[in-house]
Amino acid sequence: MEKITLNPIARVEGTVNLPGSKSLSNRALLLAALAKGTTKVTNLLDSDDVRHMLNALKRLGVSYTLSDDKTVCEVQGLGRAFEWQNGLSLFLGNAGTAMRPLTAALCLANSGNESPAEIVLTGEPRMKERPIKHLVDALLQAGAEIEYLEQDGYPPLAIRNKGLHGGKVKIDGSVSSQFLTALLMAAPMSAADTEIEIIGDLVSKPYIDITLNMMKIFGVEVENRNYQRFTVKGCQQYQSPKTFLVEGDASSASYFLAAGAIKGCVKVTGVGKNSIQGDRLFADVLTAMGAKITWGEDFIRAEQGELSGVDMDMNHIPDAAMTIATAALFAKGETVIRNIYNWRVKETDRLAAMATELRKVGATVEEGEDFIRIQPLPLAEFKHAEIETYNDHRMAMCFALIALSDTPVTILDPKCTAKTFPTFFDEFSRISQ
């Protein structure tokens, strides 16, 4: 297996221009494909997950042109629901941001569509372990025709595009906000209004804000009543905004901001105080820990401070919260990250993976059902470990921070960062001294 060893880093300093946000990139591509008119999407993320979405859209008859560096995509919108030849199968890798929204969008029918066609959505083995039942249950209430091809509640799925009739739909919000995002994005093209009621506590609310914000940019307003009920008018058509700029990925910013907070000064550009991404709030956690944070319109800067552990609910920033788990090793006092059950249904079971790998470097860790408790280490007591990444891009990037100790760190399968940040280790090396 390929691996990379990072030697101890004395200091980090520099500016990192962030790649586009994965969450925004795949939402923008899907909305642009469904919208009337041509949309030029700029600062698109060039990564595995986005490639899976682009490949799927092409096979669904969407025309687009991609720049040589794959960061500008001009999408010819269909102005209608997707159509395909019966029996089409789409492979979506481990891209939840493609699997979930497409599951809902492919249920939609065009007027006059007399004979629904079947399509199969499948992916890597890990995708077949990632639950989708809450979304499918909600879509079935709205009139969808979906069947599980292997294990109940999990992909692969067979979908027939016989349409969604709207009406009252209940959806469980406790596992993933992507299920609600998928339902919201399909609802305007249903045959009638949809009233969505959330069961349980909605996780990752800031990701719903991204969805609602982007739907508005594409011409559709949603009535949001305190994240408990959403009303979406039916028989609508998305309208191209002509251009859409993808913000820098705030989750990807977290590794560099944490590095600056631990041992130097790092500025990230492409995301700032007006960002629509919830993970910008990661910087507030660093502030609470003692880092010096500066906010700009289009940048965030983190400078080294004396870091102290925190005990916080991080349900609102589940992806960026992983970075706090490794940064916690450099703080005084224990850190507890709470209300993160949905780590268990991500690219891997991130709670188990994080606890296992932190222990390898010498940390004392308690893994709860929905929390993790971490005791810090003196810099000289870190152990040189080989870090398993579990084909999870965020595990690889989080553990790069271990090199800010007095000990090297070896990361297995470093290329798994291609899911969201193919050049991560080059950028990390560039700011390291």
Swiss-Prot record:
Keywords noted in UniProt: Amino-acid biosynthesis, Aromatic amino acid biosynthesis, Cytoplasm, Transferase
Broadest EC class assigned to this enzyme: transferase
A GO CC term attached to the entry: cytoplasm
Gene Ontology biological process terms, A to Z: amino acid biosynthetic process; aromatic amino acid family biosynthetic process; chorismate biosynthetic process
Catalytic center residues: D319 (proton acceptor)
Residues that hold phosphoenolpyruvate according to the record: K22, G96, R130, Q178, R350, R394, K419
Record EC number: 2.5.1.19
Residues reported to bind 3-phosphoshikimate: K22, S23, R27, S176, S177, Q178, S204, D319, N342, K346
InterPro entries linked: Enolpyruvate_Tfrase_dom (IPR001986), Enolpyruvate_Tfrase_sf (IPR036968), EPSP_synthase (IPR006264), EPSP_synthase_CS (IPR023193), RNA3'P_cycl/enolpyr_Trfase_a/b (IPR013792)
Catalyzed reaction equations: 3-phosphoshikimate + phosphoenolpyruvate = 5-O-(1-carboxyvinyl)-3-phosphoshikimate + phosphate
Functional pathway: Metabolic intermediate biosynthesis; chorismate biosynthesis; chorismate from D-erythrose 4-phosphate and phosphoenolpyruvate: step 6/7
Gene Ontology MF term list: 3-phosphoshikimate 1-carboxyvinyltransferase activity
Location of this chain's protein in the cell: Cytoplasm
Disulfide bridge map: none
Summary of the function given for this chain in its UniProt record: Catalyzes the transfer of the enolpyruvyl moiety of phosphoenolpyruvate (PEP) to the 5-hydroxyl of shikimate-3-phosphate (S3P) to produce enolpyruvyl shikimate-3-phosphate and inorganic phosphate.
Subunit structure: Monomer.
Family: Belongs to the EPSP synthase family.
Protein name: 3-phosphoshikimate 1-carboxyvinyltransferase
Organism: Actinobacillus succinogenes (strain ATCC 55618 / DSM 22257 / CCUG 43843 / 130Z)
